[in-house]
């Protein structure tokens, strides 16, 4: 009897073991060699509410406000045109009143503090989870306006909560755009002892030209840059009738002005008008929007910073406390960030950088032809890449010298970027043709590959994720950048013919819609 019972138990255990071995892999939890919670510090902060819980930011009201004030703006414009003093004061005042009204509940006080009860919704309590962490489990939201020291403190508290509920000793950190400035402040203030890996994705923590130039008033109108920007706009715009009427009017006007060589004339007069308007509009327009928000000063580039303070604050003592906040970040975090990151890496924190390129900045700044993702320049987002200008290639002499120095592998196949000059060349990825505000899942796959690797994940770790990747907008997938991208479409007769046909197509579609609404 005892022997029979033993055999039955043995058979039962054997069946259980077989079931465990033969059960489908899909039913088993995925295993990752480095499975840690991911804290995602998003870009731009989050929605902001007034004391009555009405959402005030992000605002969609500027476009609406302009439409609602077309008559006022048009009247002010006409008065400025016929002004005996040939100034634009009427239009400047009208623009300021419109913007000030739209942002009056958003801006902070002269000390860079919230004094009107505006706020964000607090982050949800982190959920208890022990494994299979994803990029969306722990998203840290923040008020992008306030002192980055306050946000770093809140991030530290959030990380501690995540570690408590997960039972882990470290987190993975990723900062996107403005979120990278929060991580920068966090690493400066609290160190990296709780961070396994930090990824900087389309990072703005070394400044961005558009915001910097807005703060200093250094707006320029470069004809060549505007024509290049216009050509890209037309190539990426629909020409099958999906465009709206106003876009087609702009498109047609641009094409005709370029065809008749009027672009220089138009730009010259627009620039003159801007200079006259800016004379009375600065600095009050900056103060009405972002000027009193320490969080936005974190993205003012080093070569613009001192001038920006002079332009915006004009030496006025009432801004002393605000200036203390922004100076702390700029001198202790911004300027020292490369050293901070190197120190963290030496202490064992893994680092990765993902930057984007081949999309021009708005053609209103002196550096607008630099490689960028339409908002952040590649040189700063990658922490030091050497780049050609948009539409250009790195010089042959430069490439030859780099190859002789044994650094040829860091040159992009399209000959536009050299990663060897980056802070971390082996841990920096470049994605071509991916706009700044587009974040496809295909990039998340790369991010999670980096996070799941026990050893530092490099540009050579996985052939699928080589250093230079191309974003395919149709499939939303990534592919390798190849030498085929070297072709310059500007010299193609086929492209020239297509542009000519697009001109007639736009004209035809515009006429058709005009008749439809008449």
Regions found by a protein language model. Give the residues of each.
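Alpha/beta-hydrolase-fold enzymes
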Residues: 224-317
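Bacterial N-terminal signal peptides that target proteins for export
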Residues: 1-11
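Alpha/beta-hydrolase fold catalytic core
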Residues: 138, 146, 277-370, 392
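Hydrophobic membrane-targeting and insertion signals
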Residues: 6-7, 25-28, 199
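Charged, terminal alpha-helix-loop-beta segments
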Residues: 373-374
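Bacterial N-terminal signal peptides
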Residues: 11-20
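Sec-dependent signal peptide cleavage junction
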Residues: 19-33, 511, 518
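N-terminal non-catalytic accessory region
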Residues: 29-174, 180-232, 360, 367, ...
